From Swiss-Prot:
One of its GO terms (cellular component) is cytoplasm. It comes from the Bacteria. Residues 108-132 have a biased composition (Low complexity). This is Small ribosomal subunit protein bS16. It comes from Malacoplasma penetrans (strain HF-2) (Mycoplasma penetrans). One of its GO terms (biological process) is translation. HAMAP family: Ribosomal_bS16. InterPro entries: Ribosomal_bS16 (IPR000307), Ribosomal_bS16_CS (IPR020592), Ribosomal_bS16_dom_sf (IPR023803). Residues 82-107 have a biased composition (Basic and acidic residues). GO terms for molecular function: structural constituent of ribosome. Pfam families: Ribosomal_S16 (PF00886). Residues 82-132 are annotated as: Disordered. Belongs to the bacterial ribosomal protein bS16 family. Keywords: Ribonucleoprotein, Ribosomal protein.
Amino acid sequence: MVKIRLTRLGRHKLPFFRIVVIDSRARRDGAYIEKVGTYEPFEGVVNINEEIALSWLKKGAQPSDTVKNLLREQGVWKKFMDSKVQSKKEHNANKVKKEVKKPEAKKAAASKPASKPSASKSASQKKTVSKK
């Protein structure tokens, strides 16, 4: 699984973080796939490349809790969720169009055999009457 998380840089008691896409099994400061941005906690500066972050989120990368908060602050998470909702609406609209076409064919096929069972019902009614 691929995650978006922080890797620590900087010196003692003055941290600096890179926001990176990394395999979930890799070490905290291990080799990463791609750099998404940076975070300086003491200065409160966050730099995120939105295009790269959105592309990895759409591919299924899971952000850590801290990174998710940073993405929310920058507005990237909202863009991702909006695009996700929009794609679901489009998918559901296409699904409804396909379902509308199928029942028409089923109704036509269902109406033909319906006449045959009605004759068998009348025969079964006659049998029950004769038993009384």
